[in-house]
């Protein structure tokens, strides 16, 4: 466990300014929140620890899932600013729609390098300001109100303040440092695993298409029995907009473990654990690449091209909101009076072991995502979006899809802008006002 020293009284840091809204995290959720709030007239700063915007969408993955309901007669359930993102990718000739064989609906596969530019362009054009290479160190809170952040930058420690905050860090870093309540992955239900993704080049796509996913999994099992170190035997690969290049989701590493005292710790508790996971993930990916070249049709002359910038993290902390979305909400495709987004993705639980648990929603249906699940229970001026929003383990395993993260971002950005303008808490605003504002952005609120 790491303990953070508070700065001494009287010690001052360089101040970077005061904003209406600070969004901590510029991933799919945070970037859309910043864009939505800035378009609504707020003075916005969005901050990220990486050197580019997009978070997992640009550092780890290359496909948006969640735009459609499940089934053959799919309905589009995410729109507005997320459509602007897809249009930006299409402008580069850098996206394809790809059917998904795992029940998550049609996916939008893209070139992550172009997506970085798209995200940053949309943020800039919205009027929001972006700060990269900035790591959150400390949060100042008084009576449930976040006041100021301390950031570690290449220029040293700096402070920045705002009237309203959105935690879009993925790991709930803002809420954690603020002392707000959350459930840590693994405390109640088994935590989802980590994945280092990788790409292969010089792939013969026509040959690769001759075997389906079931045969690929059989080949993985056969290779494991022959001595290949493949801990996950249900991994996947797919074509990309880049010719003769495939992307993979194959590796698997545990995100929690017991320390020397027998206490459960995650990759957020021990920096050496996260470091070891990054190193092990790349080593594991290299073994999967060897398997592909040796055993899978179409890969005979291919080469490993690149690893994800970061190891992919599915679940760490889930903040307690005014409402927690639960498993039964998802499976019943429950609708809420205050829903601000929709999700039709299955519960996709990448637990420890060699398999993945899938539980599907009824065809053509979607669960509503209530505004209350985005309002931090312990704060009067903070919302939480993305994969650290308020949900149980199972519900989170469905709603963490990137299209839903974008939809949550729009909802939080619009709600925050109204709260700032009206000088009210989000929970005090008439929902009809938020719903009307969301509809104007093109957001889809009903199936």
Give names to the regions the model predicted.
Residues 4-18:
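A short, basic/flexible loop-to-alpha-helix module at the beginning of a structural domain
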Residues 30:
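N-terminal Rossmann-fold NAD(P) dinucleotide-binding loop
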Residues 56-57, 116, 152-153, 157-164, ...:
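Flavin (FAD/FMN)-binding glycine-rich loop and adjacent Rossmann-like elements that form
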Residues 2-7, 36, 42-43, 48-138, ...:
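Conserved N-terminal/central alpha/beta ligand/cofactor-binding core
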Residues 35-41, 177, 411:
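Alpha-helix C-terminal capping segments
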Residues 15-27:
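Beta1/beta-strand and adjacent pyrophosphate-binding region of the FAD-binding site
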Residues 143-149:
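Short, hydrophobic/aromatic-rich segments at coil-to-beta transitions
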């Amino acid at each position: 466990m790491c303990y953070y020293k508070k700065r001494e009284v009287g010690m001052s840091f360089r101040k970077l300014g005061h904003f209406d809204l600070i969004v901590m995290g510029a991933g799919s959720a945070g970037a859309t929140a910043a864009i939505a709030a800035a378009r609504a007239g707020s003075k916005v700063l969005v901050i990220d620890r990486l050197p580019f915007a997009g978070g997992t969408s640009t550092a780890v993955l290359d496909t948006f899932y969640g735009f459609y309901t499940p089934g053959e007669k799919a309905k589009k359930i995410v729109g507005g600013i997320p459509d602007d993102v897809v249009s930006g990718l299409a402008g580069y000739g850098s996206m394809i729609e790809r059917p998904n064989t795992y029940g998550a609906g049609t996916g939008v596969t893209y070139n992550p390098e172009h997506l970085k530019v798209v995200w940053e362009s949309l943020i800039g054009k919205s009027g929001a300001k972006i700060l990269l290479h900035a790591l959150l160190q400390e949060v100042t809170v008084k009576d449930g109100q976040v006041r100021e952040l301390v950031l570690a930058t290449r220029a040293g420690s700096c402070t920045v303040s705002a009237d309203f905050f959105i935690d879009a860090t993925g790991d709930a870093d803002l809420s954690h440092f603020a002392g707000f309540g959350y459930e840590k992955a693994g405390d109640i239900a088994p935590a989802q695993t980590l994945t280092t993704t990788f790409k292969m080049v010089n792939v013969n796509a026509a040959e690769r298409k001759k075997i389906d996913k079931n045969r690929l999994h059989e080949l993985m099992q056969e290779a494991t029995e022959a001595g290949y170190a493949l801990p996950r035997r249900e991994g996947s690969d797919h074509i990309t907009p880049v010719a003769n290049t495939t992307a993979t989701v194959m590796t698997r590493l545990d995100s929690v473990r017991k320390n020397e005292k027998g206490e459960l710790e995650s990759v957020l508790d021990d920096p050496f654990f996260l470091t070891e996971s990054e190193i092990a993930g790349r080593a594991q990916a290299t073994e999967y690449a060897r398997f592909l070249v040796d055993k899978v049709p179409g890969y005979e002359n291919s080469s490993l091209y690149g690893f994800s910038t970061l190891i992919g993290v599915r679940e760490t902390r889930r903040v307690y909101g005014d409402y927690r979305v639960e498993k039964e909400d998802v499976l019943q495709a429950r609708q809420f009076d205050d829903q601000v987004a929709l999700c039709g993705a299955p519960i996709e639980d990448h637990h420890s072991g060699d398999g993945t648990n899938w539980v599907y929603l009824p065809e053509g249906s979607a669960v509503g995502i209530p505004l209350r699940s985005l309002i931090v229970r312990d704060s009067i001026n903070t919302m939480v979006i993305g994969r650290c929003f308020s949900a149980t383990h199972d519900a989170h395993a469905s709603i963490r899809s990137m299209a839903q993260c974008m939809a949550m971002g729009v909802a939080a950005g619009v709600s925050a802008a109204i709260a700032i303008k009206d000088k009210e808490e989000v929970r005090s605003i008439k929902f009809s006002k938020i719903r009307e504002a969301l509809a104007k952005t093109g957001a889809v609120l009903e199936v």
